[in-house]
Amino acid sequence: MQLEIDYKQTKHCVISLSGGMDSSTLLLRAIKEYDSVTALSFNYGQKHVVELERAQSLINYLNTKGYDVKYRQIKLDGLVDLLNSALVEGGDEVPEGHYEQDNMKATVVPNRNKIFSSITQAVALSVATETGEQTDIALGIHAGDHAIYPDCRQEWRDADDHAFRMGNWDVENVGYFTPYLDGDKFDILKDGEVLCKDLNIDFDDVYVRTNTSYKPIFDEDTFEWYSDYKSASSVERVEA
């Protein structure tokens, strides 16, 4: 499908950058649409911590191309012993296969998106109040987001936004940017191709700096991490 991007006039944007394909493409879209971009990554003790290395590498690459992104990695790894999930260190084995399989529930991290959302909202509100200008939170949500993750559902997002607006002053200057709402991973990747051309950056140089795997494999010969091509996130990326 052809994505219809709602192009923004707002100056400021805050994005949660996981280091995966979706959020990395969203970062490129934000760079194109906004004057200033703040990107946040979270270390919550995830096994696939290589995604944070990829996120930093992408930021560094974009800086060399003249794109100044304010970037912060936020340490939440003190939670690792308190969270029950296959995705965190000390958790069960990460299951393989498609998201639709029941065993994928093991990859749910309790309240993860709410934790990330609260911090992202706080930063966006701080930017909005400091500048006195409209600030958007960019979300990479898309039609392929899965019901197995309750915090990817529209009902959850609506309730989360309601809580944010009820719990803070001066929230009228904070909005949302969701360019991929009606698309899937294939559409996101196609938009990435367009954005790389528009921003005059190399597609391969960008996406080699991403990780979409819950079970990345370390190659001791090259000292590089590679996708396992078996975990659900990796299977979806290959299918795209």
Positions of predicted regions on the chain:
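Glycine-rich phosphate/adenylate-binding loop
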Residues: 197-218
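ATP-dependent adenylation/nucleotidyltransferase module used to activate substrates
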Residues: 1-203, 234
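Local cysteine-cluster metal-coordination motifs and their immediate loop/turn environment
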Residues: 118, 122, 211-239
